[in-house]
């Protein structure tokens, strides 16, 4: 359901064949909020407030700082938002041109790491100028504060500090099944392990029965990776429809073993060697000679000169194998 003044969460599911492995298996990803994370392209974090940060993948640069705050701006400005990090309680606030504020609170459940060694801050609250709110809740399901952060609920249509009546809840496999394709990330200098699968998303009013439910079904691929095979949408009237997803599995032999490489194909042009062999030889010589006789009086010098010079050169080049991309497939 829609929120007030457009204040409702935006949730989207996307797929990329080059995508990684997360809470929706390999290739699929879900966007539901926002995050500020430490940039590790050029090294691990130092956790000294001088690290470089990224807002939803956009690189930030420091603009100014005081004893209690640091102001940042995107290196490529587009949204013209005010981005401030508050050092006292280690949280961020991003305010856009309309006055809507996004808050990234320091919290053991919503952050990767904690305190001085916080690596990622996830969005915890959105509030507009009319005090309408969207509140995000998380759970790392781990005693260690560096565990993977899973979204668990989003409440909207709230006002000020009060949670909204409408909510979206994220449900995970709770039957103790251990994923064979767990993802381990150590960029924060600690092991962050993603080992749960998102099994359904439900929408509620006043935390009652689901208004609508989105159920995700997975299968295990040949490499033990989890692959999303269906998405079923149902409502409280038991009406539903399903989207299915198919994958092209690698070719296997008669024993079920994956064929990683095809048989070798030879391109033969009727020569002794299937690949062309080239040879070339060059020889060069150069000789010259010169002589001279001169005569003079007392005032005129006379001399005899002579000289001989010569040069020669010889070279040979050859190519034993000439590998050519014949069919142009790289």
In which residue ranges do the predicted regions lie?
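N-terminal export/ancillary region detector
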Residues: 301, 305-317, 321-322
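Conserved catalytic cores of ATP-dependent inositol ring kinases
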Residues: 1-300, 320-330
